[in-house]
Amino acid sequence: MLSKIIIIIFIVINFINIIISSITFDIDCRDIINGGINPSSSSSNSNSGSDYSGEIILNLKNKECKDYHIEELLNNYYIQNNNNNNNNIITINGNETFGTTIIQSKKQPFLNLINDNSNNSTTTKSISLNITINNINFNNWITPILYMETINNNIDFINTNFNNHSNEILISYPIISNNDSNDNNSINKTLNSINLNNCKFENFNYLTKLNNLIMPIKLKQTSISVKTSTFINLSMNNTFFHLNQSSLTISNCSTNNITTNNFSFITLINSPTIISNYNHSNSNGSFINHINNNNDLIDFSNENMLIEFSNFNNNLILPQPQPQLELLEQRLQQLNNSDYNNNNNNNNNNNNNNNNNNNNNNNSFNENINGFIILDCENKTEKANVLFYSNQFINIMPYNINFNYSIINIKNINLILNNNNIINNINSNSNNNNSGIISKANFNNQNLIHIVNSNLTLIDSKIESDNPIGGEYSTVYIDSPSNDKIGWNKSNNTNSSDDDDSNSNSSSSGGGSGDNNSIGSSDNSKNKNNKLEWCFDCDGCVFSISTDKNVTLTNSDICPDPDAPNNSNDNGNGNGGGSGKKSYKNTILAVTISAIGIICVALLLTVVILKRRNRKSSFDYLLINQYYLDDEEEKRELLLNRNNNYYYDNNIIDN
């Protein structure tokens, strides 16, 4: 009997909980404070529309509003009316405590801005919605949170969490039927605006086989701004941001532990981008892939504003090969296709004039690339710090590659190449037709590396050129030697004017710039007989470099010892001089070495004296035991009292 009563009570309690939950859902999740709208009454008249335009505030007070959608409200009062009133404002608020209002969905998008097809119209409508979402935690979402087919919307996500997502796009771009091309002329025709402020994206899993093409944020002709947001523990088989004919601004954000299966975290197609104060760490794949038919792969230009990086925690780290290689890999896959090979075999072989013996090989073709990496911060007050670590800029590939720009073109950049290979004009010596035709890269009268007002440091890196480009188009071209700091200047000019740097600490008069990276730098325009003007400060590098006077530096021309005497003549009239800061540093180094030497000598003498004393004492001990073996008393006295040194041996004394 008692068990039956307990079961009945349990059933009643569950029934009451269900009723309370539904009441809470109806009240808290649809509590409209302003506007006087009753969604439940309007749903029965959804086809008639409404002339209402104004402000609606939805306060979602419940902590878990499951399966709740507001697309019905938006459709009934805005979309079907095709209302162009800019006063259409919708504010959706969660609890004031950040992240406590949790919304989950398994049916429809949270914001579903769709077209009205009642009149069989496919024209994208302008409804001019201003939607603000505050303090919402979207958890375990498997449908798009925001889907847009309408235009002229401004949507702000503030203090919003996106947690534990899988299987679906978060924010999708509008369908633009009338202009769905990659035409650069439409790049500024932004149709929607999205702002993510103080948001968090974490614990995404898009690694299932069905989601190879899923990108969490995919936008077209949309302006998106991401500020003070974090991206943590995201696993995908594709890029996270995919923008086409859009604009992207990212500031004060960070990524940590991102897996994109070697895709870029951001993919841009004809989309200007500004990125500042960003920290990208513990992630595989390159950070950004910029695809633009008429522009460089990566551009740090303030003028074009294609991509600008600044304040990357003092360093910009690009850990993987740059995405232009992905294009070449796609081409290689095309080559493996039999139809492609059959249709293009003759053209490919005819284009390769250097491999006439391999005309039957299907693995060669011509490819044009509009540059590789352009780092341009010319207008910045301070040089940008950029680190390329473990990159293979040009691998040994079966391609004829035509570069229209230098691989690396830097202006006002501190560039560090750590464990990099920059290889140009690599030819295969193999006679195996199955190995592919390894041809050369043609830079179309461009330099492999072009340096303007920049610092370049090589660490365990290689710069090669099997076939010198020749002329002024050299492997490395230095545009402004007076400002560039690449190793040390080796000019031996003795006719320079007095151009002593005001910041120099040199004790000599005239002649050298006090720059840390120069030795006896002077005006070399008066002396045309200089054999070497520049050299690399290079740790374990193999390189070939030419200056604008076609002087080639080989491995034997690595920078001299900075402590070696300067060859410049110091006659008191501004000639020679050398680097003041270098001289100052040399003095400190000499004093330090001398002090260390004195300390070492003192320690050595101390050790010798102590050892000699020990040897003498041991010798005395042996003498005592040798000459006084028969006289135990005298031996004991000597052992215990000689110079108060207790060379005490119990075995001898006891015996």
From Swiss-Prot:
The chain crosses the membrane at residues 5-25, 588-608. It is a multi-pass membrane protein. Residues 337-363, 484-525 are annotated as: Disordered. It is found in: Membrane. GO terms for cellular component: membrane. Coiled coil: none annotated. Residues 515-524 have a biased composition (Low complexity). Keywords: Membrane, Transmembrane, Transmembrane helix. This is Putative uncharacterized transmembrane protein DDB_G0293652.
